[in-house]
Design a protein with these regions (language model features):
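Structured beta-strand-rich core segments of catalytic domains in phosphoester-bond hydrolases
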Residues: 1-51, 144-147
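Short, catalytically relevant binding-site loops at active-site mouths
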Residues: 11-13, 38-40, 61-64, 92-94
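Metal-dependent phosphoester-hydrolase catalytic domains
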Residues: 31-36, 79-86, 92-165
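A short secondary-structure junction signal
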Residues: 56-60, 66-70, 98-99
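A long, amphipathic alpha-helix that forms part
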Residues: 66-83
């Protein structure tokens, strides 16, 4: 899905009109939904419902006040989900990981990158902008940050186990 609102200027500029977010699922999925934040240039939230988990992919605003409102909206999406959740993406937490504190407390979620290892820029990481957050019904078995430069952000690779199984 395109991450910018349909009437937005960025959606029509050549560089930005080709940018998007995607989720790939090996075993298929039960449902996909596209949510849009009310504010910010980057508004798309992809929701993918798997057999036992709901996954949300996000790219939050560069502006802190807008980001905080987006996190409140995301908090509601997590609360409305019937299954344990994983929320992942570029949170643009320019003020640091503490920006997620309210979101994590309100949702009861944990973050996979507990050491706050920098993820941006990929060629010389010095900022923690990207996160994977997960419900307590999931157990994080492995977390890695491969040192690759396919993007300006390092990928976060997680292996989860469903504790309710």
């Amino acid at each position: 899905g395109v991450k910018y609102k349909a009437s937005g200027l960025l959606r029509h500029l050549p560089v930005f009109s080709k940018q998007g977010n995607a989720l790939l699922a090996k075993d298929g999925f039960q449902r996909e939904r596209f949510h849009y934040f009310n504010q910010g240039f980057k508004r798309l939230v992809i929701e993918l419902e798997l057999e036992k988990t709901t996954l949300f992919l996000v790219h939050l605003s560069l502006r802190r006040k807008v980001r905080q409102r987006q996190l409140l909206h995301l908090q509601q999406l997590v609360a409305d989900a019937a299954k344990p959740c994983i929320v992942a993406g570029d949170f643009n937490a320019l003020m640091g990981p503490d920006e997620l504190k309210g979101f994590l407390e309100a949702t009861g979620m944990n973050k996979a990158n507990i050491d706050n290892t920098p993820t941006y820029p990929s060629w010389n990481p010095c900022r923690v902008l990207d996160f994977v957050c997960y419900s307590p019904a999931l157990k994080l078995n492995a977390f890695t940050l491969p040192k690759v430069t396919f993007s300006d952000h390092l990928p976060l690779v997680c292996d989860f186990e469903d504790l309710s199984a």
